[in-house]
Amino acid sequence: MKRIAMLAAACVIAVPAFAQNVATVNGKPITQKSLDEFVKLVVSQGATDSPQLREQIKQEMINRQVFVQAAEKDGVAKQADVQTEIELARQGILVRALMADYLQKHPVTDAQVKAEYEKIKKEQAGKMEYKVRHILVEDEKTANDLLAQVKSNKSKFDDLAKKNSKDPGSAERGGDLGWAPATNYVQPFAEAVTKLKKGQLVDKPVQTQFGWHVIQVDDTRPVEFPAMDQVRPQLEEMLRQQTLANYQKQLREQAKIQ
């Protein structure tokens, strides 16, 4: 019911005077057309059209009309802050409708998706990702002590990370951060990672804003770019946002803004 109530607040539907009414509230009609449109809206959100749903929506529309009439009678509707909210809601509805209409008239094409895919794939070509583990501590001395222990016996890394690392996310996994490109990490952590080869350990602890790190690269591999179908939804959404951004820029350039 709450979900339907929220939709009702945003649902403004103009109907002809001759439309068939499903109810009246103090002479104010609730038309069959407005009910049908409201049902269509709710069904588009995942509900199933049924007599029970239609009755529920009708009762909610009646409740809304009762409250609206009370607000108008008591003068609430004329309050400045209420008028501001109404205007903002109206603007929001118009903006969303305009964007939807523009995207319908300017849909993302397969050619655009393919071009964007190839562009990103080319940008990622030759890039590496790293399987990294680290031990994070608060001071340099502790980091140096731990680094010395690992250098003497790399098999100790797992236990030392579990016992000493301040990174709760990786400590329980022996410091393992999993596979990721170096760009996922802060500098100078990322810089240290890219300088290490498979199985190598840093020569000295690395300091970041989080503390001091003992870093080891367990493995490296080229970034495996996903097939286009796997990322198509994300590419389409990105292109839609670009389309809207360009449309907004165009409208602003045409507008007289002072």
UniProtKB/Swiss-Prot annotation:
Biased composition (Basic and acidic residues): 158-175
Protein name (Swiss-Prot/TrEMBL): Probable parvulin-type peptidyl-prolyl cis-trans isomerase
Residues of the PpiC domain: 127-219
InterPro entries, sorted: PPIase_dom_sf, PPIase_PpiC, PPIase_PpiC_CS, PrsA_foldase
GO MF, any single term: peptidyl-prolyl cis-trans isomerase activity
Top-level division of the source organism's lineage: Bacteria
Membrane-spanning intervals of the chain: none
Region (Disordered): 158-178
Top EC category: isomerase
EC code: 5.2.1.8
PANTHER family the UniProt entry points to: FOLDASE PROTEIN PRSA, PEPTIDYLPROLYL ISOMERASE
Reaction(s) this enzyme catalyzes, per UniProt: [protein]-peptidylproline (omega=180) = [protein]-peptidylproline (omega=0)
Keyword annotations of the record: Isomerase, Rotamase, Signal
Signal sequence, renumbered to the chain: 1-19
Family in the record: Belongs to the PpiC/parvulin rotamase family.
